[in-house]
């Protein structure tokens, strides 16, 4: 009886919506302007990072993250996850360059939690952990990254550089 009551409430609520209420588009449709804004912030962040202007890079990556997280809920979660992990990993690198090691670790850890088996995320996490002198955890992060990308020698070099 309770289930029917709840169902009736939902049906009555839906009936109150105007007939022209828009349906969300399919999840493979992305808002072009938003995608362009995200790409622009990433490009500006990357350009600033290459110039070693890390504070500006952080600002642009942060703006990009804000745009990504403002995407409508009906857009594809896999696209959002891909965009977000790259932007978090990039901001982690910029934070690390500014010696904001805890913030760098937070971003790298979030990227790894979102994407899982992703070498770049594990590499950034390992670098941040090493900067915090948490060497065993750094070694574990580098080893996980190396499992994701067995041909990438950077992981072995990073492990060898640990005390």
Where are these regions (language model features)?
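Alpha-helical tetratricopeptide repeat
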Residues: 1-163
């Amino acid at each position: 009886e309770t289930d029917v009551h709840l169902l009736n409430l939902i049906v009555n609520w839906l009936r109150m919506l105007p007939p022209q209420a828009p349906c969300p588009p399919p999840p493979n449709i992305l808002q072009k302007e938003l995608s362009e804004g995200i790409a622009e912030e990433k490009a500006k962040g990357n350009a600033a990072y290459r110039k070693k202007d890390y504070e500006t890079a952080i600002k642009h990556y942060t703006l990009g993250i804000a745009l990504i997280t403002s995407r409508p809920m009906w857009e594809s979660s896999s696209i959002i996850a891909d965009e977000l992990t790259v932007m978090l990993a990039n901001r982690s690198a910029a934070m690390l360059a500014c010696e904001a090691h805890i913030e760098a670790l937070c971003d790298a850890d979030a990227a790894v939690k979102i994407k899982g088996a992703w070498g770049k995320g594990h590499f950034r996490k390992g670098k941040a952990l090493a900067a915090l002198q948490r060497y065993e955890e750094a070694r574990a992060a580098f080893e996980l990254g190396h499992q994701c990308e067995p041909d990438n020698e950077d992981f072995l070099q990073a492990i060898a550089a640990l005390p």
